[in-house]
Amino acid sequence: MNQTPWKFKTFRDLLLKSVAERDLFTGKSLHALYVKSIVASSTYLSNHFVNLYSKCGRLSYARAAFYSTEEPNVFSYNVIVKAYAKDSKIHIARQLFDEIPQPDTVSYNTLISGYADARETFAAMVLFKRMRKLGFEVDGFTLSGLIAACCDRVDLIKQLHCFSVSGGFDSYSSVNNAFVTYYSKGGLLREAVSVFYGMDELRDEVSWNSMIVAYGQHKEGAKALALYKEMIFKGFKIDMFTLASVLNALTSLDHLIGGRQFHGKLIKAGFHQNSHVGSGLIDFYSKCGGCDGMYDSEKVFQEILSPDLVVWNTMISGYSMNEELSEEAVKSFRQMQRIGHRPDDCSFVCVTSACSNLSSPSQCKQIHGLAIKSHIPSNRISVNNALISLYYKSGNLQDARWVFDRMPELNAVSFNCMIKGYAQHGHGTEALLLYQRMLDSGIAPNKITFVAVLSACAHCGKVDEGQEYFNTMKETFKIEPEAEHYSCMIDLLGRAGKLEEAERFIDAMPYKPGSVAWAALLGACRKHKNMALAERAANELMVMQPLAATPYVMLANMYADARKWEEMASVRKSMRGKRIRKKPGCSWIEVKKKKHVFVAEDWSHPMIREVNEYLEEMMKKMKKVGYVMDKKWAMVKEDEAGEGDEEMRLGHHSEKLAVAFGLMSTRDGEELVVVKNLRICGDCHNAIKFMSAVAGREIIVRDNLRFHCFKDGKCSCGDYW
């Protein structure tokens, strides 16, 4: 067919416009005409069809267009390598890269960026060294990609910074912007600030946006907002990325009113329907507004014209951060897939967080299986770390360790998750051994590591070791203790019965003790029956959390235990006067992939009669081997209790009902996992120890503080929780 210059030019312009606008419909129509030879076959045009399909996420079409190119050139290969890397198929991208007859700098940059997206630091560094050895010119794109690939290795980022300065690359805005971003993500805000202010005239919009985000990440929201105002004053263009950065700053300030006002400005400017800005708004409301904020997040979500994967992930994350909405997170995850979005690493991290709150063994396996089927690479550390947390929070410490042991690469988060899992399950010694392995592996601990380690020391009574770790954190690793570390130390001393030392510790804190510290001290006082100190701790908590029932309930329990009925009545009267209500005890267990919920003294479960009959028979067997009901947990004065009232109350606590249902509904020898919304009561704790011995079962109970692993009449908590 004869071809005229105007026909080729028109066709080319339409194709380039389709690529720029990601217009798949027009692009496919043009491709059909191209195949019918309306214009002559051309490597140039074929390359742009590959590029179009890649940008539109149609890898199969991109592959077909590439292999139909008669004479592929280096650009052809670069585009298809990028397409496979973008689709998380980095191994195929590498195979295609190796087939390039004469790769250029762009080829290397493309694959290095692919390795960065895949978090394959080592492979990116090896490729960079090969590139330099073969004499290829390194440019700003090379270094920017390499810095991103080293996002988990601050030591390598520092080395690259030295290389960029010595090589003159510090004059590239893109390189400096990458350093600002990844220094911040690596926890080095000071270095990020130094790079930003050292750029002077090189600073562009990306530089300002990156620095605003950095301040937000480090809870320096006021500085972020000041920088935003300075950016406007200096005449820089404000775009959707800037606005999202400001939302991040407002989120770090927990500034709900300011965020709502900013939302109003976004609506006036017409940015609220943008996916990037919308994602920032959803994140803001979910973090600053709690459960109520999620209603605002849902409204924002509904207004976004075309929610992309990031928006869906943010919505799922918001639900998962609010435990009561975990079911909604799972529903959104499924809905996202139904409309055609394929979950990525972030999707799985968010949904596993929600499933952790639900403690559903069947969902653990489903999510893990789906991650494998979705071709999420086995070396994705973030997904594996999330699976470790999912398994141990669902009571399955063995599978958590199975995932940990098979990870091709471990980082600080991996060790933190596993150490925390051991600590919460009462396996303090194993947690400390793992911490030592972490040090031997050359991975530096962080503040979260020490929270887990100190918690492990508390659970296994290693007071001296705990104090040593606390000192090491400050002196060796230069980590300043935060409120959570002090709370762990108070818990450690309190568990060991060193209440005066714990009180001195709380009084010597460099800042005002928070509710977690006083709650830890109150729990220790309850264990060791120190009424005077308990009253002080409870009163402090009542001031800090005036509507929380926990300090009132714990103090009332202690008064009841000491037979101080008037004081107990006074606490209860105070609760009624302030309209503070204790949450009803609620426990649930999953049997045959179905969740069964039990509430204390509630008869709504369809099998409650059979459960009570089974429990009565179990109680008879337990009493024969030494179980005695601890009636003080009934919280009823002896002279006011009717015959059998105390036994009736204690016998129908939700955790006992859930365990009884599990025993009668599952095979002999099968492990049970029960979740309770409140702290397990002393009598139930003792009763379940006997139930585990009589039934010959391992019973795991997760309350609102920790895990209790009952086996052969003993509990992993050592009877202190």
Curated annotation (Swiss-Prot):
It comes from the Eukaryota. InterPro entries: DYW_dom, E_motif, Eplus_motif, Pentatricopeptide_rpt, PPR_At4g14850-like_plant, TPR-like_helical_dom_sf. Disulfide bonds: none annotated. Residues 593-623 are annotated as: Type E(+) motif. It holds the Pfam family Eplus_motif. GO terms for molecular function: RNA binding; zinc ion binding. Keywords: Repeat. Residues 624-721 are annotated as: Type DYW motif. Residues 517-592 are annotated as: Type E motif. GO terms for biological process: RNA modification. PPR repeats lie at residues 42-72, 73-103, 104-138, 139-169, 172-202, 204-238, 239-273, 274-307, 308-343, 344-378, 380-410, 411-445, 446-476, 482-512. Belongs to the PPR family. PCMP-H subfamily. This is Pentatricopeptide repeat-containing protein At3g49710. It comes from Arabidopsis thaliana.
